Amino acid sequence: MPKRLDINTILVIGSGPIVIGQAAEFDYSGTQACQSLKEEGYKVILVNSNPATIMTDTATADKVYIEPLTLEFVSRIIRKERPDAILPTLGGQTGLNMAVELAKSGVLEECGVEILGTKLSAIEQAEDRDLFRTLMQELNEPTPPSEIIHNLDEAYGFVNEIGYPVIVRPAFTLGGTGGGICHNEEELIEIVTSGLKHSPVTQCLLEKSIAGCKEIEYEVMRDSNDNAIVVCNMENIDPVGVHTGDSIVVAPSQTLSDREYQMLRNTSLRIIRALGIEGGCNVQLALDPYSFQYYVIEVNPRVSRSSALASKATGYPIAKLAAKIAVGLTLDEIVNPVTQKTYACFEPALDYVVSKIPRWPFDKFESANRTLGTQMKATGEVMSIGRNLEESLLKAVRSLELGIYHLELDHLKELDKETMKKRIIKADDERLFIVAEAIRQGVTKEEINEWCEMDFFFLQKVENIVNMEREVKANVGNMEVLQTAKEMGFSDHYIAAAWNKTEREIYDMRKENNMTPVFKMVDTCAAEFESATPYYYSTYADENELIVTDRKSVVVLGSGPIRIGQGVEFDYATVHSVWAIKEAGYEAIIINNNPETVSTDFSISDKLYFEPLTIEDVMHIIDLEKPEGVIVQFGGQTAINLAAKLEEHGVKILGTSLEDLDRAEDRDKFEAALTKLGIPQPVGKTATTVEQAVAIAEEIGYPVLVRPSYVLGGRAMEIVYRQEELLHYMKNAVKVHADHPVLIDRYMVGKEIEVDAISDGENVFIPGIMEHIERAGVHSGDSIGVYPPQSLSEKLKEQIIEHTIALGKGLNIVGLLNIQFVVFKDQVYVIEVNPRASRTVPFLSKITGVPMANVATKVILGQDLVEQGYGTGYHPEEKEVYVKAPVFSFAKLRSVDTTLGPEMKSTGEVMGKDLTLEKALYKGLVASGINIPTHGSVIITVADKDKEEAMEIAKRFHEIGYNLLATAGTAQSLTEQNIPVQVVNKIDSEDYNLLDIIRQGKAQFVINTLTKGKQPARDGFRIRRESVENGVACLTSLDTTRAILRVLESMTFSAHSMKEITQTKRHEVVHA
């Protein structure tokens, strides 16, 4: 069927900010969809709130709206633009929920807008647990025994009948939010209450736990002619019970017999047909390992995280084709863009094994509960490709960027058998490493299978790796053993440690013996047809499929998995850099391992290498490609950390030199540079011992800011107020020694300013200056940023511009630099300089129209700023106000303190823009998920040091009509200031207390500033966590609270009696 000609304009709904459960995969799918629809001649309008994406670039769609994804704003855009149709299935759960809300509100009917791809009835049938269960019964498809519940009493009824354990699955939620496995009544109360709160329709499915079954996923496509295919089937190494986003996944499935494969394939196709989905769909199934009994777990009637993985695993671009199907094209009409010969109705075939390992944020949140269940906790993931599962797994392990090069963790070697058993039974993020350790210590595969029901096939593969370790250690210098180890995916790093040599010595030894990997192509058809796509992976085999051209090439290092501190912003910069390299006439080569991102879409670069970002894996590519050089500025700390090793191998680092990179990162060298340039910075020193740290802090005076050198995202950074806190930090947060010094600075309570600039060594161009709403001390990634600055005097702005230009030239920066300043007592101080792309590059690029990563790349390639039409100086400021607001995923991470400080905690960001600061802030806050009601109650409980400041805030809340609630101490201070307040009991009271008010939804805001000593038992911690669990905005910074007050005050009409007004006027006349 040809494409539809009765529609012209299509509104694509994006997925909003990155949160746990919904990450960069929707930037990839949304970008693909917009381009795909434009190719077919449709006018595309995009709405998304996330400025850090390629999707929200003006070139992606005909019109781009960066606005909150709420009914209020999306309805306004629909009424203004009058699209013929909307496509919501590429915006994740956000897009689906938005489509349902728009339909129910009547806006779609009012404006004559059609839903494309997946009809509303199919969305509701797949997402509403009751309707889905009914459909499965009609199809005779087995589902676990289950019950739909809307309250706790109904949950008790089901459990009394079926017994524990039960799984709670809330309806219309993302990444299993609010759900979990209940083993007893206490867990049932907690998880059901949470699930009902998080479900927008207050509905949960309770089902008998089938934990222990194999979990299998089928990624399927269907068109309007009822052609349906399986793009990819995947198997979770972790059995049912761990969310698929937190599971280690392999593709294709490894342990299914042909009968099992065909049985589950037929079921998946039957389901997509019954739902009438036109596009992509993900079906999750459970299979009993001892019989042919299977169960349908759930269906995602949209493009998902698994679709992105399946697309990268097979080379089959699901989102691109789903968009074409949505406008009426059929699979047998669409040419496969990989082979450019076959059609999209051919099912992909794989002659390799793909492994996906999640990347969790537990290195950031040490207090978080690491147990894995049905609620997702990973922020991102890595993917690797190999010719066997062992190779594929080990490549994925070293892609995680946790300083791990092999399936072993030193701290697990001390575990006894009983501890290992407990941790293997109750899965956590280290389970596969513990399984390997158990096998090393002689635990049998049978015992491990009994503990966790992981398939014997996977346990055998882990045992193969452990047996090979013994071979390697027993045969030092043996080339045959080395060859076998390399074929199994062992890294030079591991072999070097086993043979007591350096990694470079192993690398040289292999080269002398011609022991290097070959590169194979990902072609969707197992080499049956010729492929036109240069998408490669390395393996130790005979035939090399790589074609090295004569063109001059440049390598860009990607930023690896999404994690807190290094998000999609770096992928944005990477993609723009690749495009600039192509524009400059070079062959653009990218190395990355993140299946979710736009940068690993094979159509972006001239060559894509899906490889770990380690020195060994990168050098294999460089040895073959022999590029002009490597750009490390856009891949975050991942790429910067490789710069020194690459230079040791004789590789040219393009842009800012290694020496100058080091000068910006090394404390003493940086201090010397600032002194030479006459630029002030907070008083600070470097400590290499605990004693030294104590002495420095005494000399500088508390409070001090302490952090390790060379960090990203404020990792292990803290403000300490007294000596005992400093000693706790030095013993627990960092391992201090001569090679890893700790930096100690005077903490200045001032206004923080952030600047991004581009330097060519001679000229320094400043696209924008941003002001942070929160004072210095809250990580820049967690602050609300405002452009243009609203409270900076011209004199201070000039100082900042002068310092930025001096730093760009003085540090010999070639490319991008990011500087953070603090304004303290009308003086500008430099806090830090990052000689690379920062997380504000996409935001400022979109606002100012300066494509910063593109311009910087061309500078790096030798085209100076003047040639590109830019000179030294500050770009004229825009008239509108733009706000960048952080988005957090605390609801997914139990036991994590929500207090903001110098260590970054946000997972994503949104943008609000309007004519005034208040309106822009309103949009930013609403887009970030903060509800802003114009009246209600606010609980105020603050530390003693903040009481004076909190009084003014409380007074303003009272004046706009809010009720004030406070515990005795704070209430007394308010009463003394004649501010009406209701006293509430502290949380240790057995009577109705502060936590009850939060649980019952009777407070709209909680203002709670940190009481020191962050152990979870603290009252402050419990209040903050209770707020998160109950969806109440908890404000831990008084600066953020003031920003919200500005918005509330701008929304509130004043109400004064005539007498008050007359008295005020009389007072003014008397005093005139």
UniProtKB/Swiss-Prot annotation:
Keyword Amino-acid biosynthesis (UniProt): yes
Comment text on domains: The large subunit is composed of 2 ATP-grasp domains that are involved in binding the 2 ATP molecules needed for carbamoyl phosphate synthesis. The N-terminal ATP-grasp domain (referred to as the carboxyphosphate synthetic component) catalyzes the ATP-dependent phosphorylation of hydrogencarbonate to carboxyphosphate and the subsequent nucleophilic attack by ammonia to form a carbamate intermediate.
Positions of the UniProt region annotated as Carbamoyl phosphate synthetic domain: 547-929
Ligand binding (ATP 1): R129, R169, G175, G176, K208, I210, E215, G241, V242, H243, Q284, E298
Disulfide bridges in this chain: none
Pfam family for this entry, one: CPSase_L_D3
Membership in a protein family: Belongs to the CarB family.
Binding positions (Mg(2+) 3): Q820, E832
Chain sites annotated for binding Mg(2+) 2: E298, N300
PROSITE patterns in the record: ATP_GRASP, CPSASE_1, CPSASE_2, MGS
Protein name as it appears in the record: Carbamoyl phosphate synthase large chain
Domain ATP-grasp residue range list: 133-327, 671-861
Region entry Allosteric domain, spans: 930-1072
Binding site for Mg(2+) 1: Q284, E298
Catalytically driven reaction(s): hydrogencarbonate + L-glutamine + 2 ATP + H2O = carbamoyl phosphate + L-glutamate + 2 ADP + phosphate + 2 H(+)
InterPro entries xrefs: ATP-grasp, ATP_grasp_subdomain_1, CarbamoylP_synth_lsu, CarbamoylP_synth_lsu_oligo, CarbamoylP_synth_lsu_oligo_sf, CbamoylP_synth_lsu-like_ATP-bd, CbamoylP_synth_lsu_CPSase_dom, MGS-like_dom
Any one cellular-component term (Gene Ontology): cytoplasm
Keyword annotations of the record: Amino-acid biosynthesis, Arginine biosynthesis, ATP-binding, Ligase, Magnesium, Manganese, Metal-binding, Nucleotide-binding, Pyrimidine biosynthesis, Repeat
Binding site for Mn(2+) 3: Q820, E832
Cofactor dependency: Mg(2+); Mn(2+)
